[in-house]
Curated annotation (Swiss-Prot):
Lineage: Eukaryota, Metazoa, Chordata, Craniata, Vertebrata
SUPFAM superfamilies assigned to the protein according to its UniProt record, in alphabetical order: Ankyrin repeat, SOCS box-like
Cross-referenced PANTHER family: ANKYRIN REPEAT AND SOCS BOX PROTEIN 11, SOWAH (DROSOPHILA) HOMOLOG
An individual GO BP term: protein ubiquitination
Subunit structure: Substrate-recognition component of the ECS(ASB11) complex, composed of ASB11, CUL5, ELOB, ELOC and RNF7/RBX2.
Pathway given in the UniProt record: Protein modification; protein ubiquitination
Major localization class: endoplasmic reticulum
Protein name stated in the entry: Ankyrin repeat and SOCS box protein 11
ANK repeat locations: 64-93, 97-126, 130-159, 162-191, 195-224, 227-256
Domain SOCS box: from-to ranges: 274-323
Function description: Substrate-recognition component of a cullin-5-RING E3 ubiquitin-protein ligase complex (ECS complex, also named CRL5 complex), which mediates the ubiquitination and subsequent proteasomal degradation of target proteins, such as BIK, DIRAS2 and RPN1. The ECS(ASB11) complex acts as a regulator of the endoplasmic reticulum unfolded protein response by mediating ubiquitination and degradation of BIK.
Family per similarity comment: Belongs to the ankyrin SOCS box (ASB) family.
Gene3D superfamilies given in the database record: Ankyrin repeat-containing domain, SOCS box
């Protein structure tokens, strides 16, 4: 009976009904999305928000298309942006990825637009679905002016581990000024992020010599990198001898081994300038170097300021400060 024509007839009817229902539901979704786009283009944001709420389940300020305010902020068109705000456009409208106009302004380095948005109530610590804040975007673009404005309006300089780290992004792209501003606002100089490591480790990985030098001057831990991998391991994989010299001058441990049991020398390319530099550093350091490292270790992370208070002869002070 189960294999008879009646059974197969009912089975085909059931499959047809299920497929029809599925495609009808899909058609409704597409229709609502197109209708949302139509209202956004025509400027009817209130109706667009209502439709978006139906599609995305309660997120009333969220849709896939960027608003005119997003475009004005991204392009740095201050007059257009102020006009839209004066017309009552919500400064905290976000896209489906939770990108706000403030995110766009900071990514473009448009400080005037960013300030106008903040003065009109833009969320200074808004987070996208990828964990990026306006401050992260400002560090990405290298806009020190945007970084300062955001901090003035209460931006958090350091977030939880799972969010994108502004200081790591600044270091990665070699934006030293942004990095220094963040450090001046109490960001942990040795903040380790999974998959990235510490700011010094990132600077060595991307061979940002200026950032490496400044981080070491300000007291970054020379051997703190990414878990067992030290900044010297990261530098050894690259080709910049200057970074190797900076790290060893600040007392990097050449004998430290990573999770694979390898030292920095093991990671250097054979017969390369990096390998030669590491081999030259394997001998015992000079007594003056040992004394300098000992003094700086005793003074701690604040040694850069503390050395000036010791009232030492200028040549000795400059030596302790690596000048």
């Amino acid at each position: 009976m189960e294999d008879g024509p009646v059974f197969y007839g009912f089975k085909n009817i059931f499959i047809t009904m299920f497929a029809t229902f599925f495609f009808f539901k899909l058609l409704i979704k597409v229709f609502l999305a197109l209708l949302t786009h139509f209202y956004i283009v025509k400027g009817n944001r209130k109706e667009a928000a209502r439709i978006a709420e139906e599609i995305y389940g309660g997120i009333s300020d969220c849709w896939a298309d960027r608003s005119p305010l997003h475009e004005a902020a991204a392009q740095g068109r201050l007059l257009a942006l102020k006009t839209l705000i004066a017309q009552g456009v919500n400064v905290n409208l976000v896209t489906i990825n939770r990108v706000s106009s403030l995110h766009e302004a900071c990514l473009g380095g448009h400080v005037a637009c960013a300030k106008a948005l903040l003065e009109n109530g833009a969320h200074v610590n808004g987070v996208t679905v990828h964990g990026a804040t306006p401050l992260f975007n400002a560090c990405c673009s290298g806009s020190a002016a945007c970084v300062n404005v955001l901090l003035e309006f209460g931006a958090k300089a350091q977030f939880e581990v799972h969010l994108a780290s502004p200081i790591h992004e600044a270091v990665k792209r070699g934006h030293r000024e942004c990095m220094e501003i963040l450090l001046a606002n109490n960001v942990n100089i040795d903040h380790e992020v999974p998959q990235l490591g510490t700011p010094l480790y990132v600077a060595c990985t991307y061979q940002r010599v200026d950032c490496v030098k400044k981080l070491l001057e300000l007291g970054a831990s020379v051997d703190h990198g990414q878990w067992l991998d030290t900044p010297l391991h990261a530098a050894a994989r690259q080709s910049n001898v200057e970074v190797i010299h900076l790290l060893t001058d600040y007392g990097a441990n050449l004998k430290r081994r990573n999770a694979q049991g390898k030292s920095a020398l093991d990671l250097a390319a054979p017969k390369s300038s990096v390998e030669q530099a590491l081999l030259l550093c394997e001998g015992p350091p000079a007594l003056s170097q040992l004394c300098r490292l000992c003094v700086r270790k005793c003074l701690g992370r604040a040694c850069h300021q503390a050395i000036h208070k010791l009232h030492l002869p200028e040549p000795l002070e400059r030596f302790l400060l690596y000048q």
